[in-house]
Amino acid sequence: MKNKTKNEACPFRLRASRDALEIIQGKWRIPIVISLMYGTKRFGEIQRDIGDVSPKMLSQELKALEENKIISRTLYDSMPVTVEYSLTPLGHSMEKLLDELLNWGNHFRKEIVGK
Amino acid sequence: MKNKTKNEACPFRLRASRDALEIIQGKWRIPIVISLMYGTKRFGEIQRDIGDVSPKMLSQELKALEENKIISRTLYDSMPVTVEYSLTPLGHSMEKLLDELLNWGNHFRKEIVGK
């Protein structure tokens, strides 16, 4: 067996990454944020962007993102009442992370799926 | 209600991001990859880096990462037999994504937790 360098991983890096992972976990949160990168939207418009998310799940995930201050929900006192979702500055700060996710997703697809 | 630009999210972006998300999903895969960024390691060394992962879960997640060609597993015919894990080139290609995850995790912590 070759002699290899074995350094312990930086606990600071591990913690920060786990914080981020906790926020973006699951199948729907990142797609929701990507959808709202394209502008303020109503519930049905987000659902249309994502395609295969159930209303119940979308509603739950929007709530979680709102609690974490990634998106904001605005209620308009119109007839009928209108609700719109948009990214907060914290939500917009995810843009570079999403770009890297996209880059790596493409790379992975090319390497593994081969197209 | 103001008139706002409402563009549909790019389906290509959504698909690539979902590919990437599927690979890194869960609490442990990213920490495992971070641990192995610091060098080839044995099971116990990875477990020590991460801290609170159970052996059963770690074993399951290492297997999933191996199936997706993110890590490789090498068996040494020593006494006792030794198993080592390391990142493949595809695993190493996650470095920029992990950096952004770390950056955003720090930013999020400062904004929300306030420290």
Listing of model-derived features with the role each one plays in the protein:
Chain A
Residues 69:
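Glycine-centered, phosphate/nucleic-acid-interacting loop/turn motifs that mediate DNA/RNA or nucleotide
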Residues 1-12:
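N-terminal intrinsically disordered/low-complexity leader segments
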